[in-house]
Amino acid sequence: MNNDLTADSIIEMISSSKKKTPVIAYVKGHLSDIDMSGVQFFGTDNFGIIFADYEDLRQFLEKNGNKIHDVHIEAKARNSALPMADITKFNARVEPGAVIRDLVKIGDGAVIMMGAIINVGAVIGEKTMIDMNAVIGGRAIIGRNCHIGAGAVIAGVIEPPSATPVVIEDNVMVGANAVVLEGVKVGKGSVVAAGAVVVSDVDPYTVVAGIPAKFIKKVDEKTIEKTKIIEILRQRDH
């Protein structure tokens, strides 16, 4: 899977988009006589739920305040430039609490765990697991059959803009709380130890550790056994 978005194109989308403040409002009152055009309403004559942008809701409430007895408003974002992804389009396992922006690609059989954050333009390969609270920055490219450990950070390249995204090739294991900095390429089959800070490219089938990350050894049979991907965790019912 390739990343077709440049930093400049994402910056242009963010700067030119209409900023939105999506809200949910729970309303009580004499609702049967109210014109609901401009908002999305679900309910009865005296109680309902409204989905709208905050400015549209504000105008709606001002216009119909004499018919509404009570209202509770919950805002999902404020002046948001890009929407969240429609996760139903992914043939992957996405756990509750994962935060995935629009314009993200996620391959078949991938696993996105609770609290993981995937920013705009990122690419996640088939059967790759993004573990709890990991952060995948804008335009980062993660290959197939990888494991990005809990709390790890794969740097984004939107601000400051960079032409070269982070690339994690296939079958890479990134340990918990490791950090891979902007523009770095981690070669196929490599292992990045927990807590490492990777500031330069990593050769394929290499183990690196430390701050900054340095060569420890080539991947051997013992390393492969300790870092193997568990296929059953990537299975889906359909």
UniProtKB/Swiss-Prot annotation:
Superkingdom of origin: Bacteria
Intrachain S-S bonds: none
Leader sequence segment: none
Pfam families registered for this protein in UniProt: DapH_N, Hexapep, Hexapep_2
GO MF assignments: tetrahydrodipicolinate N-acetyltransferase activity
SUPFAM superfamilies cross-referenced by the UniProt entry: Trimeric LpxA-like enzymes
Presence of the UniProt keyword Acyltransferase in the record: yes
Pathway(s) the chain acts in: Amino-acid biosynthesis; L-lysine biosynthesis via DAP pathway; LL-2,6-diaminopimelate from (S)-tetrahydrodipicolinate (acetylase route): step 1/3
Enzymatic class: transferase
TM segment ranges: none
Family classification: Belongs to the transferase hexapeptide repeat family. DapH subfamily.
Function: Catalyzes the transfer of an acetyl group from acetyl-CoA to tetrahydrodipicolinate.
HAMAP family: DapH (MF_01691)
Matching PANTHER family: 2,3,4,5-TETRAHYDROPYRIDINE-2,6-DICARBOXYLATE N-ACETYLTRANSFERASE, ACETYLTRANSFERASE
UniProt name for this protein: 2,3,4,5-tetrahydropyridine-2,6-dicarboxylate N-acetyltransferase
Organism, scientific name: Pseudothermotoga lettingae (strain ATCC BAA-301 / DSM 14385 / NBRC 107922 / TMO) (Thermotoga lettingae)
Gene transcribed to yield this protein: dapH
